[in-house]
């Protein structure tokens, strides 16, 4: 029985922790970045204790709640209020089995019926199934679904829609099929799901229409640079990943340097590991990188309101810090010898949970190519 499997139990425990933690926290989603700055700084600290909890909170407040705030309009405010109180749990359904980084080619469709003021959401192919959707397998009531908007035979590109996944009894809505993605290398407390839409009907108002809408005559109307504006609003989430990755690096270095000072090896009078140049050569460059990354992250946070550079700052933070964190964790694990391999060192668990940071919210190698566009 699925509900008695260790994987399910692990997810229930994380969800209970999530609810308990948020019962002590009052967070308001707003369009200004003041509260967002506080949230990502909080995420930074929680990375030291529970990366899974950070991911689950980020899905609820950043990927779901903040996206409605940034891409929606006043008519969507009720979703934000219920997200803050956890009456609604949401998820972010962009990635598909066949497409991740290339969102322009997403295959999920949203076909507009003007006479009925409705959209029909459909995943016509296996490759169009929404996949790796955090909080989607078990808990999310709603999803922000990114789909190609069709009016008649004309495609107007990728747009975000609110689609209900489950009712109050946690039963899937009509024509919505949800599967569990199963075990992962890490973050197994987070319920990643596969979501299939078989011509699911949603009302017109479920279109997040800050940058594009359909007028009373059925004509499509969009602001100039719609897609780039939409993606820029979403890019800030990567900055939190950069901060979290770097604080993990700092933790690993602190533990390793403490060990290296106390641990003595070789010679008639044994010397601390840190006194050896070969050891310094391994650890000190990583320490220097962590300081530089920290300074850059603080700079990026202080310039969140400048959307002209935030997109690129967040890319630099995520890529530099996530890659450096994995390098640091591995070097620190080896630098602590067998003790670094012990479960209580936390190095191994952190590595497994952080590994995906180089991929989700944008593959690092692909993201770096966007830096060339910065002027």
Predicted regions span which residues?
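Amphipathic, small/basic residue-rich leader segments at the start of a protein or domain
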Residues: 1-90, 100-101, 112-120, 305
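Alpha-helical interface subdomain recognition
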Residues: 1-48, 232-375
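Sensory/regulatory domains in signal-transduction proteins
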Residues: 67, 94-101, 128-129, 136, ...
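Short Pro/Gly-enriched beta-strand edge/turn motifs at strand-loop
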Residues: 87-94, 175-179
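A short core secondary-structure module
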Residues: 114, 118-178
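Flexible, small-/acidic-enriched active-site or ligand-binding loops
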Residues: 173-199
